[in-house]
């Protein structure tokens, strides 16, 4: 197989949660442990940083990576989902995994993958560990895929675990209360390690404290020590930056200082290519893309909207099945012109599903590019266009813009 055929096999032949939903989710560590053993890999031969939580995992991984790069370390990152290219998920510094490595890996291990019945995510994680091990990264930053306790990434023994925050998402799998969700996330806390918690929550703090006591693990709540320093005018990114800084400090790196931290924050785009977090993709009118897809995310973007001056606001939304749309759109300004579209995946909410979720009539077009063109035609140069609801909208809209 060439690379295009290999990528197609990975994306379309393996059970893929992002495309198919919970039917493709394969919880548990038995199969991934078998896979790692078949690959002759060891789950503790790298210096791991394990990042979980509901929101902010990806940006936290990116800021940790950027700061460590400025300290002259070779840093691997494993994140999800990807926006434009599968290879975004596996990087060393800001260099995507080589196509040739992916093709060779799948060719060599295809029969093992099929015999074990591995999911897309399990294969991707095995690929990442193989790549980082071969390239002898100094640190490997691993983002949890879903939950924590039963996530494929939970076979690692990290130097430090991070839980950014706890909010409602994937409730059909993780549970429908914050306490149940926190219990799943707390599964990444390992014995005699460290835990960094980004945001305090009176409903979940004790769960993390008790788990850390059981594991003889040190716990740090970032909000107790972060101070008043503002690194970004995007509030939720500022929280994630503080979490990233405390994570890097917990590694006790002698060369780490305030100047290196400052450079890491300033050079985030150069070092990591971070995208999808209140990303400006057009001007006159201002066009923003944000990957918010749950209540906490929509609350954050509503806060950002309140800081911007504009004439009218146009919001293009696309969702995967299972989203409680009323609980999300209630955060948006009352005078918003709201449009809905479909995503080009089988999990996309349909027109009928969107209509049945809302009390008022909706403007809908199943073609993202067409409705985006319509919005741009109707908007004046002083308006704001916001695209959000799912990372799957990014590729369609970004290419069109």
Please place each PLM-identified region on the residue numbering.
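Short functional linear segments
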Residues: 1-53, 60, 66-71, 78
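N-terminal phosphate/diphosphate-binding loop that engages ATP/GTP or pyrophosphate donors
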Residues: 61-108
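Hydrophobic alpha-helical packing residues
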Residues: 64-69, 132, 251, 358, ...
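Nucleotide phosphate-binding/pyrophosphate-handling subdomain across enzymes
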Residues: 45, 134, 139-144, 152-162, ...
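Internal gly/pro-rich beta-alpha loop/helix module
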Residues: 159-160, 173-180, 185-188, 193-246
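Flexible active-site lid/hinge loop adjacent to a nucleotide/diphosphate
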Residues: 113-120, 124-199
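C-terminal helical cap/extension that packs against the catalytic core
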Residues: 200-220, 286-287, 326-384
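Active-site-proximal loop/hinge segments that shape catalytic or ion-binding/gating pockets
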Residues: 390
